[in-house]
């Protein structure tokens, strides 16, 4: 914490931390909200330093915070609360989190360190707080999902309920990289995938993996393809051959899907959207996943997750790609050409954590591919901004 206005204690004095620790000896219900908030940002609400009574009081305080409306966020405000008649605001501006509150008729502010900010985020209630374009978080909680749904669906549900954003600046820097590996990436993924590990959707309609495999084969994507090659678009006859080999020709039930895929597979922007979603550099490496997990465990998060080392979880990785057609209102080039733009969301969900549940790291990239984008290294490089990646962590308790 760079300043210490929320207490009378000096940040740089060695007595500051001892004072924080000594507050556990004070009757908890006599502590001011400032003292409680100070303990939360110092240790986190799930710290083993806290007793159950203290955690209850901390949770009660944090439950008072609500997401701020968009019109309230001129200075980056993302949460607010009114506690004991005192207005408190949490703001994030240029990557720095500040706590604002009224002290009499004066507004006091405190800037939080990175660790204090993370402690604060992990202590927020399970509501969605918008922290700007890059970070939209749901406060992390452990969940028990009793369902007979397939594992990928359970994982996706849990991810949406139990996530914590991890800063990505140290792990994702693609400003100086190209897409030279993209053709090999999609070839390896599709060749190795089965229906349980990779799912591809267009406007919520699942695209069969065999259909995608036949498509990339017809496009000339194989293990020997030149990484610099610009893909040549398929003719109607080529696409029609792929469609007819995957759908019964006389079955009218598939007529809508056949017409849809026939149109999509001749659109260079769709091919760009599809192939770019497999680019390996969009996703975190396994070593970074292990490093992040070690950091989480070292900060006593295992206390919240009921960490049990003797129970193992088999490693698994699911790849979910969602492509939606969009027509931006203000893009005259798109409307004039009559083409379509595509919004892509590519998520990898590796489970590899040792615990009494399933640990998930969600690595997600979302970006827009404009109409007419050519499926080439240059076209893809221009389509995907480096700031679009985010990593989140979740725990799922097994169905018992």
Swiss-Prot record:
GO terms, molecular function: cysteine-type endopeptidase activity
Record keywords, A-Z: Hydrolase, Plasmid, Protease, Secreted, Thiol protease, Virulence
Main location as per UniProt: secreted
InterPro entries, per the entry: Cys_protease_VirA/EspG (IPR009669), Cys_protease_VirA/EspG_N (IPR043098)
Localization of this protein: Secreted
E.C. number(s) listed in UniProt: 3.4.22.-
Region annotated Tubulin-binding domain, chain positions: 224-315
Name of this protein: Cysteine protease-like VirA
Gene responsible for this protein: virA
């Amino acid at each position: 914490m760079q300043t210490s206005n929320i207490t009378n204690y000096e940040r740089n004095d060695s007595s500051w931390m001892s004072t924080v620790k000594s507050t556990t000896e004070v009757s908890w219900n006599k502590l001011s909200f400032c003292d409680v908030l100070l303990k939360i940002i110092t240790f986190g609400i799930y710290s083993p330093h806290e007793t159950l009574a203290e955690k209850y009081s901390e949770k009660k305080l944090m439950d008072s915070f609500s997401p701020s409306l968009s019109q309230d966020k001129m200075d980056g405000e993302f949460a607010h609360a009114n506690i004991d008649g005192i207005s408190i605001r949490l703001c994030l501006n240029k990557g720095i989190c500040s706590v604002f509150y009224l002290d009499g008729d004066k507004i006091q502010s405190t800037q939080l360190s990175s660790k204090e900010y993370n402690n604060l985020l992990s202590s927020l209630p399970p509501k969605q707080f918008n922290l700007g374009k890059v970070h939209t978080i749901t406060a992390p909680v452990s969940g028990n999902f009793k369902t007979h749904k397939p594992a990928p669906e359970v994982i996706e549900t849990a991810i949406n309920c139990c996530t914590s954003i991890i800063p990505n600046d140290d792990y994702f820097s693609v400003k100086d990289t190209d897409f030279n590996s993209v053709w090999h990436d999609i070839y390896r993924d599709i060749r190795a995938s089965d229906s349980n590990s990779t799912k591809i959707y267009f406007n919520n309609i699942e695209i069969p993996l065999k259909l995608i495999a036949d498509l990339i084969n017809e496009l000339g994507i194989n293990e020997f393809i030149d990484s610099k090659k610009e893909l040549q678009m398929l003719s109607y006859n080529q696409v029609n051959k792929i469609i007819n080999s995957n759908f019964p020709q006389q079955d009218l039930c598939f007529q809508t899907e056949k017409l849809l895929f026939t149109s999509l597979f001749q659109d260079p922007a769709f091919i760009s959207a599809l192939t770019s979603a497999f680019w390996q550099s969009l996703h975190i490496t396994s070593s970074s996943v292990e490093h992040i997990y070690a950091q989480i465990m070292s900060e006593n998060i295992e206390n919240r997750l009921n960490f049990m080392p003797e129970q193992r979880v088999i490693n698994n990785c699911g790849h979910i790609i969602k492509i939606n057609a969009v027509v931006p209102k203000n893009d005259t080039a798109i409307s004039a050409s009559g083409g379509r733009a595509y919004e892509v969301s590519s998520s990898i969900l590796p489970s590899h954590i040792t615990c009494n549940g399933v640990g998930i790291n969600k690595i997600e990239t979302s970006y827009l591919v404009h109409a007419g984008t050519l499926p080439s290294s240059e076209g893809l490089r221009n389509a995907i901004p480096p700031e679009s990646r985010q990593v989140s962590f979740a725990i799922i308790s097994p169905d018992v």
